[in-house]
């Protein structure tokens, strides 16, 4: 196709998209693909279908491109990312595995897919493969962050701490990494060490309920019962579901401050959720 004609049609597509005329843009893109078949046009059309909610149509466009050029990796990588965005984890893994030897970034995406499927051991394997084959880039530090989360879920707290510290090189100002660090220190009973990351997480994202929960847990262990009360109360206000454990922890925070009526109320709330929860039953009994 003549270059000037191609530029004109691409400008026309941009104009239609700006005006919200997506069907017009799709028609022109389909015609351009028939005439030139360039990779970027397939990608643009797939993303346009995706933006309209036609995920399967976008996937078909990308599969058509792969069928035309099965030896080329880029369309497969793009399809893998596309499937990932749309939570089609198993299909993403299948596509990306076909290029894992030639495209290191696919290892990261496979690992992420396994993590979302809660296949943590497989996720670890692929994240570690990615780290070995990647340079010192931001994605490597992101892999360390995810490995910290995975190791925490597997109760491997020492290795979770190591990965979290590695991720700090770039992600020190990311609230979730600070929360992971605080949770790991809490699980290792290193409560004083947990203070700095939980404070940082609170500063970075004061509206995140899970940060309030762990702030309450940490301050309770440090016997700062007033702060424990405040953060646990905030967590309860922000949450639609609260466990008997959290109600009991708040009740104990009140009890340590000799606020017996408040303690009784929250022990009872805990027992309403789980009548067999012994810490709440024992706490209420102590008030008799």
Features from the language model and the residues they span:
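Helix-start (N-cap) detector for alpha-helical repeat units in TPR-like alpha-solenoids
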Residues: 6, 39-40, 73-74, 103-107, ...
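Canonical tetratricopeptide repeat
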Residues: 11, 44, 78, 109-112, ...
